[in-house]
Every structure is written in structure tokens, then in C-alpha cells.
A protein has these predicted regions:
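Alpha/beta catalytic barrel-like cores
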Residues: 86-226, 315, 327
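Conserved phosphate-binding/catalytic region of the ribokinase-like
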Residues: 1-90
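Alpha-helical scaffolding segments of alpha/beta enzyme cores, especially the outer helices
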Residues: 136, 140, 231-245, 275-279, ...
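Conserved, mostly hydrophobic/aromatic
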Residues: 112, 253, 290
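Catalytic-face loop-and-helix region of soluble metabolic enzyme cores
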Residues: 289, 293-334
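Catalytic beta/alpha-barrel core
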Residues: 160-163, 212-232, 269-272, 276-300, ...
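Internal active-site segments that recognize and position negatively charged phosphoryl groups
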Residues: 225-266, 273-276
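Alpha-helix-loop-beta-strand connector modules within alpha/beta enzyme cores
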Residues: 175-186, 232-251, 303-319
Length: 334
């Protein structure tokens, strides 16, 4: 159209007001947001609102290109822009930034878990051998996974759970192969959870390769005494926020130990797992993966419905073995 004599008379769209943390990338972000509307035939008002919102999100975050929003983030921000003056601190927006970019799809994965620490230490002690031999054992187990991948044609469908206490060399050997890799952060058998690494867990995760999935085992029953339950919830919230911030996927291994008898877990046909998952979702804790004990067919259906309702971006469920007989595992998968 005609260019007005005064700039104040030109077409304009106000931008959301945000706390500025970074001065780079706003122009690129504006153009990307503008084009996301223009290429779909939107009018200039919509295009400019999307462009302004994209630019606002980038300057409200640290970094440049990595701060660019996805369409889901942009839609959420536009719907809440009036009250989101500090986008960097909004948990839902940070979660969307974590889960909505394109990620590798795992429709099926066969995982060999050998992140055991206290159990293998005890076996070594019983056998009268030094625990110093355990790192070599874990390297051999990585070789076993590689051989299984080759012989059974499981490329892109195989993985391992490996610790960094006895398995640091094994982790290095497994990383970079395109495997699904989980790495535990909890001190074995700690209840409430104690993180094994020294220092804030958020700082620790910043040094992990992005392909390694943060795995945490948590003993949690919705009927636990309030102090213990709250301690576990606080630790899981801290871990969830740290993993989201560092860009790592999170696997939450949930074991509903019976209150008053932590050596035994609740049966798979009661609702303790479902109630525990619901509680975590209510707290804003949305792990990318769940690791759950075998459940009844009815419970699996309820879990599937719960995940679909509360976290459509969930990566899936890994089923716990817990030394169960093969017949029980087959039934649980069915």
C-alpha cells in the first residue's frame, strides 16, 4: 500500500513486553514468526503478532538460535502473553521448548539394564573378587549389546542403562552409536532420593552428552507419610526442571513400595502407580519416559489414557523386570 508521510501513521502491531536477557536473534526470530503466518495466508496483523512474539521469546531467553520457539510454544505464548513477562521462568513454556522440537522416534526399543551398583558390589564381595573388576564387566556388557544389535538386526531399536560409578568406560563406549542410553542419577536404595553426584544436579547435567537420558529411581507411594512423600516430590521437581533446562530427556522409574514395608512393592492390580503418576503430573512433573513395574491389563489401559490426557508428548513406558519370571513378563506385555 501507500507509504504514509509520518511513521506514526504506518501499520503497526504492539509487541509483548518481556524481561530482556539477550540482544541477539530478535530479527531472525521476527522473520520466522512472520513467515509462519504469511505462508499460511494470514493477514498482516496475525503475521506481525507472530513475528513480534517470536522475537520477544528469543530476547527473553539466553542464547540465540537455540532459543527460537516452536509453533506450540508460540501459540502458548500468544495465548498468555499478557501475564508472561518473564518467559524464561515459565515452566510450561520451558517444557514445550524441550518436548516440541523434532526428536528421534523410538517406536520399539530393547534395553539391557546393567546400571546396578550395590547389587554387583555385593556379588563381587560374595565371590571374593575386587570391585575394581566391575568396570571391565560393564565394558563386556556393552560388547554384548553391540553383538546382539548386529546378530538380531536391531539397529535403531536397542539400548542400555549404564551407571557412571562402575560403568564410566562403558558409557563412553556406548555413547555415539545411536543407542537409547539411560544414565542413573540417584544413590542406590536412597529413600528419599539422594543424587549421587556432588553439587547441584542442574550443573552436573550440563556436562552430560545430550543423547544420554537422565534416569532416576524413586520409591514413592501416594499413601506414604507426608514428610517422606513431600521430600520425594521436591527432589523430582528439582530433577525435572534441571533436565528440562539442560535439554536432556528424563526417565522416572517409579516403584510404589508399600507404606511401612519398603522392601515390598504394591501389587500390579491396585491403583498405586496410577495415583502416583497423577500426583506427579499435578505437580508439573512430566518425565519423557516412565519406567513402571508390570501392571494388569486394565491398569495398562488406564495408564495409557492418563498419559494421553496429561502429556501427549510422552515418549513412552519402559517396563521394569524386577526379577519377575518370564511368564509374568509375557503376561504383562500382553
Amino acid at each position: 500500500g501507500e507509504i504514509p508521510a509520518c511513521l506514526d501513521q504506518a501499520f503497526s502491531v504492539p509487541s509483548p513486553r518481556v524481561e530482556v536477557l539477550n540482544l541477539l536473534g530478535a530479527g531472525d526470530a521476527f522473520l520466522a514468526g512472520f513467515l509462519s503466518g504469511w505462508l499460511r495466508g494470514a493477514d498482516y496483523g496475525v503475521c506481525c503478532r507472530r513475528g513480534n512474539a517470536s522475537g520477544a521469546l528469543v530476547v527473553a531467553r539466553h542464547a540465540c538460535a537455540p532459543a527460537m520457539p516452536t509453533e506450540a510454544e508460540l501459540d502458548y505464548f500468544l495465548a498468555h502473553a499478557d501475564c508472561l513477562t518473564e518467559p524464561a521462568h515459565d515452566l510450561t513454556l520451558n517444557w514445550l521448548h524441550h518436548v516440541t522440537p523434532k526428536r528421534r522416534i523410538w517406536n520399539e526399543v530393547f534395553i539391557f539394564a546393567f546400571d546396578h551398583r550395590s547389587q554387583l558390589y555385593e556379588l563381587a564381595r560374595q565371590a571374593g573378587v575386587s570391585e575394581k573388576r566391575l568396570p571391565h564387566l560393564k565394558k563386556l556388557l556393552v560388547d554384548t549389546v553391540a553383538l546382539t544389535e548386529e546378530r538380531l538386526g536391531l539397529a535403531g531399536r536397542i539400548g542400555a542403562l549404564i551407571d557412571d560409578l562402575y560403568g564410566e568406560d562403558a558409557l563412553h563406549a556406548a555413547t555415539g552409536r545411536g543407542w537409547w542410553i539411560g544414565r542413573p542419577v540417584e544413590r542406590p536404595e536412597s529413600n528419599p532420593v539422594v543424587f549421587e553426584a556432588v553439587g547441584p544436579i542442574a550443573a552436573v547435567l550440563e556436562h552430560w552428552p545430550k543423547e544420554q537420558i537422565v534416569k532416576c529411581l524413586v520409591f514413592y507411594h501416594p499413601d506414604d507419610p507426608a514428610p517422606r512423600r513431600q521430600a520425594q516430590e521436591n527432589q523430582m521437581r528439582t530433577l525435572s526442571e534441571a533436565a528440562t533446562s539442560s535439554g536432556h530427556e528424563l526417565l522416572l522409574e517409579l516403584i510404589p513400595a508399600i507404606p511401612g514395608d519398603p522392601s515390598h512393592q504394591a501389587p500390579g492390580n491396585d491403583d498405586s502407580v496410577i495415583r502416583a503418576m497423577t500426583r506427579f503430573y499435578d505437580l508439573g512433573i512430566r518425565p519423557d519416559w516412565w519406567k513402571l513395574p508390570p501392571q494388569s491389563a486394565e491398569n495398562w489401559q488406564r495408564i495409557d489414557t492418563l498419559i494421553a490426557q496429561r502429556d501427549p508428548y510422552s515418549r513412552g513406558v519402559v517396563m521394569l523386570g524386577l526379577n519377575a519370571p518370564i511368564e509374568r513378563l509375557i503376561t504383562a506385555f500382553a
